[in-house]
Amino acid sequence: MYQTDQLLQVSANLFKHLGDIPNGEERDEYIETINTMLDKRETIIKGLKQEGFQFDEQNRIHRTLLELDKGIKQRLAAVMDAVKQDMANLQKTKKSEQQYFNPYSNVRVMDGMYYDKKN
């Protein structure tokens, strides 16, 4: 029973931590914290599986864990979407910057070319 309480505490902390997504330089530390919390949670879950943990719908703690797990999955998806959006914006910025420095790199015009035909 001790591990289920520990899992509940770690899951609640993770759910709370996933509540707001920081911007900029703070995001790297934020993601590292998420990874460490997920690793802790994973080790606790593996320990529970080795003990032969059985889910009981009548148990209040088990239902709370299930609800927290659903919320964690939703918030993790939101974090992933935010990171994907930032990566897409970064790629767009890089492309715009490259286009600014060399505006004629993608132009494929054959103007000014001629073929010298010698018999």
UniProtKB/Swiss-Prot annotation:
It is found in: Cytoplasm, Cytosol. Belongs to the bacillales FliT family. This is Flagellar protein FliT. Its main location: cytoplasm. Residues 72-99 form a coiled coil. Keywords: Bacterial flagellum biogenesis, Chaperone, Coiled coil, Cytoplasm. May act as an export chaperone for the filament capping protein FliD. GO terms for cellular component: cytosol. Homodimer. One of its GO terms (biological process) is bacterial-type flagellum organization.
